[in-house]
């Protein structure tokens, strides 16, 4: 797979999964902007050395990368990142929004600051990034956007107490993916998402793991960012070197919104009586 001549922005790329994505893309020939605010595990604070160190590490290997330290929770910060990519490499073909954080807060203790950080990085940031990247992506011969979701949000089976802020943000990115995959289709911009599992500092892991390695997720993300990927609106679940793709699809025979082609009920009592049928549809 060859990314020579293509330019990618990877957010949250100073460490963990994002660094693995950036390193693989750069190794495959891409120009890469490594963006990272250097926040802690709860999305607070900042350390400008994180992105710069990651960029220098790859530059020392002869790869074409630049570092970017900025606050992507603001519209202005996202615009500056896109402009950084254009200034450095003259084009933009790939946008990978990986930045995020995992924090637990019971619902009865939910507060605006905690929720706000989740909303910023998971909703505002991808929207603002796409807003400013869009005009450049439209000129690319193979424009790709990769957002980030989580099985902890998508599947009740994997949900955990205290993850309301995290789950809300990760599910929001699926809505953004669906909307932008439709908006991008006429101009050739493909929008997908990855739902990764990897042992990183978010898990409190500081040493190289023996399994669930971040670098084992990277090939899937590289594919979504590549010219070989021809699909849009998919979620790529990636864990331990294994991959499965899924997306939201409608039931056969539906004429939305006038006919769901399923169980009819005219009262709450009928809904209750036919609930077993309804939930199996």
Language-model-detected regions and their locations in the chain:
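Amphipathic alpha-helical dimer-interface segment in Rossmann-like NAD(P)H-dependent oxidoreductases
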Residues: 121-141, 181-182, 186
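A glycine-rich helix->loop->beta "capping" turn
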Residues: 3-4, 61-66, 84-97, 103, ...
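Conserved mid-core segment of classical short-chain dehydrogenase/reductases
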Residues: 47-52, 74, 87, 100-116, ...
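Canonical Rossmann dinucleotide-binding motif of NAD(H)/NADP(H)-dependent dehydrogenases/reductases
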Residues: 2-34
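Catalytic loop of short-chain dehydrogenase/reductase
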Residues: 138, 144-172, 177-178, 182-186, ...
